[in-house]
């Protein structure tokens, strides 16, 4: 074998090694490398089933926000895979199918049926089959078990939300739930809670008792109740008579309804007691004396209503609104305080009116979101605010008038001077002064009329007054928002308030009497026949045509009676209509309609559905009372919000003035008055008015038409045209004609005195000061007072003690922070008071402190005067500052003259009285702190015992005693008493 040499170079060393190469056959073959092994293959194989299920899972979120998988079952996964394979197979077959074009569609390759035979046209159906099916309603019937289950569910809902349930049997029983004795319990309304004292305080039948047994079983029904636990305010509470401990009276049916206590014994409201027990029993209703006075006189003084009253407003909200009304009309710190009442009575009329306006405005703001529920309170406060709004009286105009004619006392200058004085007094004028002013205005009008006599006489033969053939465009009857789907007018709320007309001035048609009993309409000088009998339509055409002719009544031709003129010119709306030849247009037969208001004088008349009355019977105006249809037509143009006020004004103001058979002038005058209150009625269309010159009567045509024909027709077709009759300068005979009347069956119309007509609203100095004292030691209350009534700060100058107490509590600093960006004048007042408190604290005597305060009144008054302001206490603050300023100026003058004015004893008595009020507030604050402290100690004991073992009770009692002694002090006379009280509680 050959030997070869191989050279290996290692650095600088060269090494030669011999070697023999191996033969070719012995060379090792190439080694095959095995496949790569995945270390996670086994893990993936184990998790493949889980991942496969996770692929079909959905994600859901738990209540705490954690997202997790919701896995499908094996059956669901199989169904999903099967549907997926079917969709893939269908898609594949569709994609691989050969393309095709549909060019013709036949039935089995034959001809269409339309070519095989001719179509035979059958009879045409001219009617549409009825598609709607009649619905039948079954009366729900409940078994005894279902009824009990329903009562149980209602009880659970109402007891949770503090609602109420009404049980209706022979009489209604109202059950409400409130928290009593630590749980929600059922409460019924007893007689003494309504202000009535009866020997049996609560009565109910057996059915009601059974229902009360179910409704009263609330949570903690079986808890034991002691007689000493019951307090005032627990009247009517239903308790279990088997769980009572103490001196209780007799009860039955497993229920005990709390009434009151007599000689330590609690009586059931269903028990009949003697007269002596009833008189001496202590009722458990809160504020019993107050409600006795209120409820005892409420029923006697309330006014009759035209509806059935229901309790639809929560009592708590009513109480809050009553508080708003009281503080808006008669503000006081205590309603029983005679000083508040006297100070209110001593206010000048001008100041009272200003404060009334301000308090009414603040009352509306306090009402807030409840304005929609308490619309009557909103309306009253709005009217009060409007009536007491300050009038801008110009003294310059008064002086100019007085300089011109002040010394002249003859007419008409005397009347002008009276009006000048009247305008200067503004809203302080009395009713007598209003009457004198109106008489003076009447005298001036007569003087002007007599002075300008320019009445001209014209020739009646040339008089023409054609009736327009075009109908008036009534926007209110054309607006889509006021029409239903059949284009009929929607009365809305006006329909409800129109019942004041129907109940007082209309009567129902009695079908038993027949229509003939209502055909003749009586008036002072004759009769007019209605077409009400034509509601019975004869089917004979000749008879029908005969009835359509009517009964003709001849009227005189066109004369001076038919015209009205002013300043020699005709007032055409106040005249009778004529034809082209000058002859009068005579009325024809007007057919009757059912339950319609017929309006419009020109063109085609308009028929408006009458508002629904109290029944479905037909209504007709009472004898001599047809002019109410004019006010009913005006109601169409009244908005739904003003409908109530409009109908009341017509009932209480217009109708009593018109009296029986008013003249056209009086009717027009009342319409003019209503137009001032409601301007939208100026274009209200009127019913057709017929003029009877023979009897000097104007007839207002209603829905029953007129059988009598031949009357003249008045051209006036709207309220604005009818108002033209209300003019003394109008020369017209028609304005003195009679129209309609008032029924004698409405004696209540004379009783229109409002119970709210007297009284007013003012924040007196005493009430404002008490309100300020209430918040000195209550930061939250004071913050709210500063936001609502910042001018309460001014009243702190009445007492140096109050001023320094407010400074020490940081109230002035808080006021500056609250108002520095809103109203800088209030922030300046707070800064001045803060500086004043520092100077007062440096004074050594009370008299010196008062002198410092009185001296600063001028600067405070200059900073406070800020024009018109809506805050309740703004006028009070100005009045206080003005009094202090004037007193300081007078005292300064007397002091310079050598007469010292300050009486040390008087100042000390005043300060002592105000300081006592401040101390009482602080005592109440401390008492509240003690109560809270005791409650915390008792609650901590309960929590301690619930967590720790019972044998540690003694140690805990010693700790509590030590804490109590540390708080109250070892020498505190009440310390031992408090310790004993807490130990007993433990």
Curated annotation (Swiss-Prot):
Gene3D superfamilies: Helper component proteinase
Key words, A-Z: Host cell junction, Host-virus interaction, Hydrolase, Inhibition of host innate immune response by virus, Protease, Serine protease, Suppressor of RNA silencing, Transport, Viral immunoevasion, Viral movement protein
Domain of life (superkingdom): Viruses
Top enzyme category: hydrolase
One of the GO BP terms on file: viral translational frameshifting
Motif (Involved in virions binding and aphid transmission): 592-594
PTM characteristics: Potyviral RNA is expressed as two polyproteins which undergo post-translational proteolytic processing. Genome polyprotein is processed by NIa-pro, P1 and HC-pro proteinases resulting in the production of at least ten individual proteins. P3N-PIPO is cleaved by P1 and HC-pro proteinases resulting in the production of three individual proteins. The P1 proteinase and the HC-pro cleave only their respective C-termini autocatalytically.
All copies of domain Peptidase S30, residue ranges: 141-284
GO CC field: host cell plasmodesma
Family (UniProt): Belongs to the potyviridae P3N-PIPO polyprotein family.
Protein name, per record: P3N-PIPO polyprotein
Organism: Potato virus Y (strain Hungarian)
């Amino acid at each position: 074998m050959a030997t070869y040499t191989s050279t290996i170079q290692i650095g600088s060393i060269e090494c030669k090694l011999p070697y023999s190469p191996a033969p070719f056959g012995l060379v090792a073959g190439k080694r095959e490398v095995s496949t790569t092994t995945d270390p996670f293959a086994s893990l993936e194989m184990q998790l493949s089933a889980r991942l496969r299920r996770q692929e079909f899972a959905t994600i859901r979120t738990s209540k705490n926000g954690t997202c997790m998988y919701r896995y499908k079952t094996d059956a669901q996964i199989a169904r999903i895979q099967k549907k997926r394979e079917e969709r893939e197979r269908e898609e594949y077959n569709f994609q691989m199918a050969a393309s095709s074009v549909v060019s013709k569609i036949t039935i089995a390759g034959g001809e269409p049926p339309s070519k095989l035979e001719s179509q035979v046209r059958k009879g045409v159906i001219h009617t549409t089959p009825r598609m709607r099916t009649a619905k039948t309603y079954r009366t729900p019937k409940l078994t005894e078990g279902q009824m009990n289950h329903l009562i149980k569910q209602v009880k659970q809902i109402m007891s949770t939300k503090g609602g109420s349930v009404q049980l209706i049997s022979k009489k209604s029983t109202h059950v409400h739930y409130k928290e009593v004795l630590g749980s929600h319990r059922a409460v019924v309304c007893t007689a003494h809670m309504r202000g009535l004292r009866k020997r049996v305080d609560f009565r109910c039948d057996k059915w009601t008792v059974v229902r009360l047994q179910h409704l009263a079983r609330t949570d903690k029904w079986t808890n034991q109740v002691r007689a000493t636990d019951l307090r005032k305010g627990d009247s009517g509470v239903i308790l279990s008579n088997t769980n009572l401990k103490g001196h209780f009276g007799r009860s039955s049916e497993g229920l005990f309804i709390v009434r009151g206590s007599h000689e330590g014994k609690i009586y059931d409201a269903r028990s009949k007691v003697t007269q002596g027990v009833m008189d001496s029993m202590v009722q458990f209703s809160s504020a019993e004396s107050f409600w006795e006075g209120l409820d005892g006189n409420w029923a006697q003084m309330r006014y009759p209503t035209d509806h059935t009253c229901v309790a639809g407003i929560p009592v708590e909200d009513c109480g809050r609104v009553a508080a708003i009304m009281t503080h808006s009309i008669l503000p006081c710190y205590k309603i029983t305080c005679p000083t508040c009442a006297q100070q209110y009575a001593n206010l000048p009329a001008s100041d009272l009116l200003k404060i009334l306006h301000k308090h009414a405005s603040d009352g509306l703001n306090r009402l807030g979101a409840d304005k929609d529920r308490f619309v009557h309170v909103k309306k009253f406060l709005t009217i009060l605010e409007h009536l007491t709004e300050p009038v801008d009286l110009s003294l310059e105009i008064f002086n100019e008038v007085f300089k011109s004619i002040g010394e002249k006392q003859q007419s008409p200058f005397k009347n002008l001077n009276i009006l000048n004085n009247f305008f200067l007094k503004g809203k302080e004028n009395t009713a007598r002064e209003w009457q004198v002013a109106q008489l003076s205005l009447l005298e001036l009008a007569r003087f002007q009329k007599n002075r300008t006599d320019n009445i001209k006489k014209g020739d009646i033969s040339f008089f023409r007054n054609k009736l327009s053939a075009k109908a008036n465009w009534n926007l209110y009857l054309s607006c889509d928002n006021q029409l239903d789907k059949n284009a009929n007018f929607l009365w809305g709320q006006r329909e409800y308030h129109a019942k004041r007309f129907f109940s007082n001035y209309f009567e129902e048609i009695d079908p038993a009497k027949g229509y003939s009993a209502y055909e003749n309409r009586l008036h002072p000088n004759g009769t007019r026949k209605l077409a009400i009998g034509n509601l019975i339509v004869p089917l004979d055409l000749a008879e029908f045509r005969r009835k359509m002719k009517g009964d003709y009544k001849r009227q005189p031709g066109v004369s001076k009676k038919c015209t009205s003129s002013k300043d020699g010119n005709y007032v055409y709306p106040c005249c009778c209509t004529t034809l082209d030849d000058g002859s009068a247009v005579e009325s024809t037969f007007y057919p009757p309609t059912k339950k319609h208001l017929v309006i419009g004088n020109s063109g085609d008349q308009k028929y408006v559905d009458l508002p629904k009355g109290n029944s479905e019977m037909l209504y007709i105006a009472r004898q001599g009372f047809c002019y109410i249809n004019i006010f009913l037509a005006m109601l169409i143009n009244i908005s739904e919000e003003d409908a109530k006020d409009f109908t009341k004004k017509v009932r209480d103001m217009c109708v009593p003035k018109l009296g029986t058979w008013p003249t056209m002038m009086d009717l027009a005058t009342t319409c003019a008055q209503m137009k001032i209150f409601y301007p939208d009625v100026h274009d209200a269309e009127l019913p057709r008015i017929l003029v009877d010159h023979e009897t000097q009567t104007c007839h207002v045509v209603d829905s029953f038409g007129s059988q009598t024909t031949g009357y003249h027709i008045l051209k006036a077709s709207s309220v604005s045209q009818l108002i033209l009759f209300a003019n003394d300068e109008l020369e017209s005979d028609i304005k003195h004609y009679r129209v309609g009347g008032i029924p004698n069956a409405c004696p209540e119309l004379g009783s229109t005195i409002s119970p709210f007509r007297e009284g007013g609203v003012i924040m007196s100095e005493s009430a404002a000061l008490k309100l300020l004292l209430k918040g000195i030691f209550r930061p939250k209350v004071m913050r709210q007072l500063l936001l609502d009534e910042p001018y309460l700060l001014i009243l702190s100058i009445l007492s140096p003690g109050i001023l320094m107490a407010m400074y020490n509590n940081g109230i002035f600093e808080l006021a500056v922070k609250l108002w520095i960006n809103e109203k800088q004048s209030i922030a300046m007042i707070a800064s001045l008071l803060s500086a004043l408190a520092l100077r007062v604290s440096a004074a050594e005597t009370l008299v010196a402190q008062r002198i410092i305060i009185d001296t600063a009144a001028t600067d405070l008054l200059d900073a406070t005067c800020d024009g018109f302001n809506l805050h309740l206490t703004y006028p009070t603050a100005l009045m206080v500052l003005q009094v202090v300023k004037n007193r300081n100026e007078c005292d300064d003058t007397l002091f310079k003259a050598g007469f010292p004015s300050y009486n040390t004893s008087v100042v000390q008595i005043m300060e002592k009285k105000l300081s006592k009020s401040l101390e009482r507030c602080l005592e109440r604050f401390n008492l509240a702190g003690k109560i809270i402290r005791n409650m915390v100690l008792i609650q901590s004991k309960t929590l301690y015992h619930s967590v720790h073992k019972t044998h540690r009770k003694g140690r805990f009692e010693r700790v509590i005693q030590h804490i109590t002694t540390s708080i109250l002090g070892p020498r505190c006379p009440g310390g031992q008493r408090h310790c004993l009280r807490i130990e007993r509680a433990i």
